[in-house]
């Protein structure tokens, strides 16, 4: 990896355990884990990877992500403090792709701005939230994003307008394009700060009560299918609540969460996901779709997605 790190000005670690960088606390080592110093450093790293034929991917907060037990062959990029700036201009909020989404929501509410408060409990980076069109409580990123700056797989900076992002339910164009979100422009609206703060506290209290925050997890595992029953309700109806394989367990608090009760492996989680899907299909006649992004499943090779991780409602 010396040909990759020679001109790199940021931080880098070899054979870095990905269990340190995912909310499931699961995952084997990455060949190289890199935190760029700035946009130019990031662009240069991507160009060198391309020139040398070395695969790369980006990881934000590590939620909604399962890394294979064998780890990742290639470069894993994480956007740190250099990509966590934020700026307000009237109702327009500009922020770096590495910003914590929940912190950004609180920042906006403290300024009396409405539109991002839905994200107060979403454990994702801003870049990941945009890539997956994260949403909760009736809100979604597509409603507030006006433009997105990305660095593509050739190391070029490109800007997409909101209407060019192909937003749909938990989807954007960045799920089919290899690019890293470095900056996002959002437009909010004025609101009642005290009312917004009360609303956020109510939602966070509900989250603490209904979600298994005491154990490592990656957020909701399955997308809610069309119809009146949620994925969690279907899993519970199928009798899978509390079911475990190895160290991985369907949460006894919320059936659409799989928790790491200690020592869980990626193989445990994948086997449990398959078991849940099979039982729900046999019992309810509905095939659940997983929203977990699995990385390194082909012999530990980085996949071609290039987008960041995200999280959505249960």
UniProtKB/Swiss-Prot annotation:
One Pfam family here: MurB_C
Protein name, per record: UDP-N-acetylenolpyruvoylglucosamine reductase
Active site: residue positions: 170, 220, 291
Catalytic reaction equation(s): UDP-N-acetyl-alpha-D-muramate + NADP(+) = UDP-N-acetyl-3-O-(1-carboxyvinyl)-alpha-D-glucosamine + NADPH + H(+)
FAD-binding PCMH-type domain ranges (all copies): 25-191
GO cellular component, one term: cytosol
Annotated compartments: Cytoplasm
Main location: cytoplasm
EC number: 1.3.1.98
SUPFAM superfamilies, alphabetized: FAD-binding/transporter-associated domain-like, Uridine diphospho-N-Acetylenolpyruvylglucosamine reductase, MurB, C-terminal domain
HAMAP family cross-referenced by the UniProt entry: MurB
PANTHER family, alphabetized: UDP-N-ACETYLENOLPYRUVOYLGLUCOSAMINE REDUCTASE (PTHR21071:SF4)
Cofactors required: FAD
GO molecular function: FAD binding; UDP-N-acetylmuramate dehydrogenase activity
Function: Cell wall formation.
One of the GO BP terms on file: peptidoglycan biosynthetic process
Family recorded in the similarity comment: Belongs to the MurB family.
Record keywords: Cell cycle, Cell division, Cell shape, Cell wall biogenesis/degradation, Cytoplasm, FAD, Flavoprotein, NADP, Oxidoreductase, Peptidoglycan synthesis
Lineage of source species: Bacteria, Bacillati, Bacillota, Clostridia, Eubacteriales
């Amino acid at each position: 990896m010396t040909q990759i790190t020679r001109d790199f000005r940021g931080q880098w670690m070899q054979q870095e355990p990905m269990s340190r960088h995912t909310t499931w606390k699961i995952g084997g080592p990455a060949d190289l884990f890199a935190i760029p110093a700035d946009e130019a450093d990031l662009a240069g790293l991507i160009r060198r990877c391309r020139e040398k034929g070395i695969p790369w991917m980006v990881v934000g907060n590590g939620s909604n992500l399962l890394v294979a037990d064998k780890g990742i062959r290639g470069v894993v990029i994480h956007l740190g403090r250099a990509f966590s700036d934020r700026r307000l201009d009237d109702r327009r909020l500009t922020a770096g792709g590495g910003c914590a989404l929940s912190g950004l929501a609180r920042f906006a509410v403290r300024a009396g701005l409405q539109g991002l408060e839905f994200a107060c409990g979403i454990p994702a980076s801003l870049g990941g939230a945009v890539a997956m069109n994260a949403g909760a409580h009736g809100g979604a990123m597509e409603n507030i994003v006006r433009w997105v700056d990305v660095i593509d797989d050739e190391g070029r900076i490109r800007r997409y307008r909101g209407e060019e992002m192909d937003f749909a339910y938990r989807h954007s164009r960045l799920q089919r394009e290899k690019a890293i979100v470095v900056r996002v422009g959002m437009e909010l609206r004025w609101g009642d700060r005290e009312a917004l703060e009360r609303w956020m506290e109510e939602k966070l209290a509900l989250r603490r009560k209904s979600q298994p925050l005491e154990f490592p997890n990656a957020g909701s595992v399955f997308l809610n299918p069309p119809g009146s029953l949620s994925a969690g309700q279907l899993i519970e109806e199928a009798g899978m609540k509390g079911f475990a394989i190895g160290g991985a367990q369907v949460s006894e608090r919320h059936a659409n969460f799989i928790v790491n009760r200690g020592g869980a492996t990626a193989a445990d989680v994948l086997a449990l996901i398959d078991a849940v899907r099979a039982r729900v299909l046999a019992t309810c006649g509905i095939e659940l779709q997983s929203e977990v992004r699995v990385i390194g499943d082909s012999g530990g090779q980085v996949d071609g997605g290039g987008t960041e991780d995200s999280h959505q409602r249960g």
